[in-house]
Amino acid sequence: MLVTNKVEKLEGKMTVPGDKSISHRAIMLSSISKGTSRVKGFLRGEDCLSTISCFRDLGIDIEDRGTEIIIQGKGLHGLSEPLNVLDAGNSGTTIRLISGILAGQKFLTIVTGDASLRKRPMERIATPLRKMGAFIEGRDYGNLAPLVIRGGNLKGMDYASPVSSAQVKSAILLAGLYGEGDTIVREKITSRDHTEKMLKGLGANISTDQGVTRLGKSELYGQSIEVPGDISSAAFFMAGAAALPGSFLITEGVGLNPTRTGIIDVLRDMGGDIEIHNLRQSGGEEIGDIMIRGKKLYGTEIGKEIIPRLIDEIPVLAIIAATAEGKTIITGAEELKVKESNRITAMVTEMQKVGIKVTELPDGMEIEGGQVITGGRVESYGDHRIAMAMAICGLFAQEPIKINDSQCIDISFPNFEEKLKAVVR
C-alpha cells in the first residue's frame, strides 16, 4: 500500500523511466528488422517485459545487458510459430500491435492477457486486419481475447479509422509491412505517431500528411535506438509541481513528441509556468528538459481535439483541477472507459471519497476547483495511472491518502515512490 501526505512543494532535478510506447515499439520493430538493434533507456516495466517475452516465444534472441537491450532481428519473415499461447499480460499495446505483425505470418498464433486485458475491446483491430486478409477469431466474435490469428497473403488497403487510436493505426501499418500494395490509414484527429517515426528510422517507405499515413513496400534494418523519458510518467510530477506554489522542478531527458505534449498545453492554459530547455532530437523524436515553477492555477476546458495528445494524463489533470480556482470541464474522453479500468468512473468515485466535488459526464467529468481534499483510503482498480494520480492527490490532502493495490504502478513506473520521496519538501 502506497501512502502519500500533504507537502509544501516539489523541488529538484529528476529523470523518469523510458517511454513506454517507444520501448514497446523498439522491441517489436527491431525483431522484424534485419540485423542487430541496440536499445538504450528501455522501460523495464511489466508491460514492456511482456512484449519481450512474446517475441522471445516467436523465436527472437533478446538479451538484457542492463545498460541496453540487444535484439537479433530476423527480418519481416523470420518469426517462428510459437509453441505456447502468447501472454501480453496487462498490455493493450502488446496485444494490439503484435496482432498486426501476426496477421502477416503464415502460421497460427493464440494471444491472450490478464483478466483486465481480456475485457478490453479488440474488434477495433480485428475488423481492419480481417479486411486485409487475416483470419482472426476470439470471444465475442473476435472482440475479446484470447485471439486466434492465422495470417499471410495480406493486401494493403485504404482505411478510415473510426477511432483516433495509435494502437489501431499501428496494428494496420505493421500488417501493411506484409501486404501487397500500399496501406493507407486516415484519422480525423491525429494520434501518437511513434510507430511512423520508428518505421521511417528503420528504413520503411512511409509518409504522413495531414492525418493520412501511407506505407509502401519496405524492409527494416536494425539500428541503435535511444528511448527518451516518458512524458506520461513525468506528467504526475509536472502536474503536482505546477499546482504547488513555490515548487521548482526539472525533469530531464523527456520525450517531447508533439502528439504527446497536450499536458504541457493544458498546464499552461491553467496558468502554469513551464519552460523547455536543452531541446534536441534522437531517432526522429524530440527530447528536452522540462522546467516547472509552481503557482496558482485556474480551471479550464479540455475538449476532444486535444484528448488524443493527453489521454493518459487525464487522471492527474483531474486531481490538480480540484486544487485550481474555478471549474474544469473534460469532454470527448470516451476512450478512458476502455483503458486498464474505466478511468472516468474510477477517478470520479475515488475523488468523491476524498471530498472533491466532481460530476461524471458520459465522455468526461466536471470538477469544482478550490476544494479542501480530506484524505482517506482509495482504490487503484489495478490501474497504474489511477494509483499514481491518487498518490499526487495525497500531496494536497489534509490527511494521508492510502492507495490499495498500488503495486500496479510497476507496470509503467517501477521506482515511482522513491522518485517522489526525493523531490517532496
UniProtKB/Swiss-Prot annotation:
The gene is aroA. GO terms for molecular function: 3-phosphoshikimate 1-carboxyvinyltransferase activity. The active site is at D312. It is found in: Cytoplasm. Catalyzes the transfer of the enolpyruvyl moiety of phosphoenolpyruvate (PEP) to the 5-hydroxyl of shikimate-3-phosphate (S3P) to produce enolpyruvyl shikimate-3-phosphate and inorganic phosphate. NCBIfam families: aroA. Belongs to the EPSP synthase family. GO terms for biological process: amino acid biosynthetic process; aromatic amino acid family biosynthetic process; chorismate biosynthetic process. This is 3-phosphoshikimate 1-carboxyvinyltransferase. Its EC number is 2.5.1.19. It comes from the Bacteria. One of its GO terms (cellular component) is cytoplasm. It comes from Alkaliphilus metalliredigens (strain QYMF). HAMAP family: EPSP_synth. Pathway: Metabolic intermediate biosynthesis; chorismate biosynthesis; chorismate from D-erythrose 4-phosphate and phosphoenolpyruvate: step 6/7.
